[in-house]
Amino acid sequence: MGQDGERPEWRLVIHGGAGVIERARMTPAEDAAIRAALDRALEAGSAILARGGSSLDAVEAAVRVLEDDPHFNAGRGSVFTYDGRIEMDASIMDGRNRNAGAVTGVTATRNPISLARRVMEQSPHVFLSREGADQFSREQGLPQEPPAYFQTPERRRQLEELRSRPSAEHFDVHLKYGTVGAVALDQEGHVAAATSTGGLTGKRWGRIGDSPIVGAGTYADDRGCAVSATGAGEYFIRVGVAHEICAQIRQRFRATIEEAQRSVPNDAEGNPTFMVHASEMDFPAGAAQEIADGVMDEVRELGGSGGVIVVTPWGDGVYSFNTPGMYRGQASPAGRSVAIYGDERQAQ
């Protein structure tokens, strides 16, 4: 809800990864560049929502901006595998019908999130991997880039630092941050989610994290919410974070929705004349935040770290993270705001 208690016409929430993100580790130039990139992503997505466009178009547009910025671990700027390769993952989901598309191990597509959407809309499948995903991307005519486009000096430095450690420290799920994502509510009351990542620095053996897995790193359902996650993917997979948050929201308010549905008159054939939508209901302020925090507590109890962004059909936009910081931002008709560090407060 907005500060005046009214449901916003639309809302967009984005993230650029969660992790050990502290002021002491960030130069003023890096801080400014990341905030500017987050604001550009919000601008791209919110322009679509403000003119009545779909939440699906908005999350794709926002994520594409972040994929094109080398500060983030997605698209250009993706981290290296242990063998010095780029393997990118992405997923997208439409809350109207729970259609979804996902890709993993992509090596040349400029914007993996757009490839995930093509999988959803132009193939009979949900999830494509590696050579098959690359082939499908080419067949769809999506822009392709050479390896050098994705590789940056900073990501190369991170890989060399990892390789210099004892072999027992070559795999650390907590080294992953910079994954990007977006969730949105449009003026029709529909939600959508999108997530894109280069994965984990030094990953081996075709490792797949939570980002391309529907229900772990991405989920959207008009009956509950839309979620995009970032962090230690192994733990997010084990908890099923994105689906768990949506399921808990849906379950908590199911009785309220069912009670409202019972008051709807039936037609001559005994069927309801219309279906009650979650966006038509007013639910307690803070409930989505409470649920997201609870699921992130479960991740922490298992030993995992990271964060989530959530948007609900009734207009809530929340963050929850158990790390020192998370690159994040949100927009609504009331305006745009971005933040990086854990102690920054934002208008909701």
Q: What is each stretch, according to the model?
A:
Residues G2-Q348:
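Alpha/propeptide regions of enzymes that mature by internal proteolysis
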